[in-house]
């Protein structure tokens, strides 16, 4: 029963379309109709600016964190990372936004933060360093996933390794168009770093 309750809560948390809410409430803009059309932090940064993008990033991280922290607080008999994955699914396929969501990078990070804060710090550091060097958000997301997968070896936790593998695969798959644009030289670079 715990899996059903916390799984549903996690999916619904993940389904909260932060970018859509910030865009409509703060700017009277449906972010899905601009830029990449993606309901994520990167599109929000590009279309609405740093303040809105930062709010969406933090909100998306919080969704993943809450999904993993709540079962721990209630001492639920569940595999917490499996529950966290449902928040990631909710972010990608949100019931509150016609199942058209984001790429789940921030929500995945938040999920890890709720269980493995040190791994989260390593992920953020990897992301920012790669972003500083490459100026590509998509490439930074992919490299962060792959580095995180390598680092999970040190945790000697098979479940964590499987979940991080799944998250890395999801991130790579969700960025397949970005990968094509990087190869073609048409992927937008950031200019603020």
UniProtKB/Swiss-Prot annotation:
Q: Which UniProt keywords apply?
A: Cell membrane, Lipid biosynthesis, Lipid metabolism, Membrane, Phospholipid biosynthesis, Phospholipid metabolism, Transferase, Transmembrane, Transmembrane helix
Where on the tree of life does the source sit, at the highest rank?
Bacteria
Q: Name one Pfam family in it.
A: G3P_acyltransf
Q: How does it sit in the membrane?
A: Multi-pass membrane protein
Instruction: Report the enzyme's class at the first EC level.
Output: transferase
- E.C. number: 2.3.1.275
Q: Which reaction does it catalyse?
A: an acyl phosphate + sn-glycerol 3-phosphate = a 1-acyl-sn-glycero-3-phosphate + phosphate
Segments spanning the bilayer are: 3-23, 54-74, 76-96, 111-131, 146-166
Please give a single GO biological process term from the UniProt record.
phospholipid biosynthetic process
Output a single Gene Ontology CC term carried by this record.
plasma membrane
Q: Where in the cell is it found?
A: Cell membrane
What would you give as a GO molecular function for this chain, any one?
acyl-phosphate glycerol-3-phosphate acyltransferase activity
Pathway annotation from the record? Lipid metabolism; phospholipid metabolism
Quaternary structure, per UniProt, is: Probably interacts with PlsX.
Q: Which family does it belong to?
A: Belongs to the PlsY family.
Function per UniProt: Catalyzes the transfer of an acyl group from acyl-phosphate (acyl-PO(4)) to glycerol-3-phosphate (G3P) to form lysophosphatidic acid (LPA). This enzyme utilizes acyl-phosphate as fatty acyl donor, but not acyl-CoA or acyl-ACP.
Protein name, UniProt field: Glycerol-3-phosphate acyltransferase 2
């Amino acid at each position: 029963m715990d899996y059903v309750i916390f799984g549903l809560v996690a999916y619904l948390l993940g389904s909260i379309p932060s970018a859509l809410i910030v865009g409509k409430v703060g700017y009277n803009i449906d972010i899905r109709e601009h830029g990449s059309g993606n309901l994520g932090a990167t599109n929000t940064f590009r279309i609405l600016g740093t303040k809105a993008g930062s709010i969406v990033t933090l909100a998306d991280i919080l969704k993943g964190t809450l999904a993993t922290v709540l079962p721990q607080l209630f001492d639920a008999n569940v595999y917490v990372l499996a529950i966290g994955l449902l928040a990631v699914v909710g972010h990608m396929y949100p019931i509150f936004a016609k199942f058209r969501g984001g790429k789940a990078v921030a929500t995945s990070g938040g999920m890890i933060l709720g269980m493995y804060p040190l791994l989260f710090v390593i992920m953020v550091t990897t992301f920012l360093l790669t972003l500083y060097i490459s100026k590509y958000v998509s490439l930074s997301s992919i490299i962060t996933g792959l580095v995180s997968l390598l680092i999970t070896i040190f945790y000697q936790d098979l479940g964590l390794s499987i979940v991080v593998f799944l998250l890395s695969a999801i991130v790579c798959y969700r960025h397949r168009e970005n990968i094509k644009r990087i190869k073609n030289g048409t992927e937008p670079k950031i200019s603020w770093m």
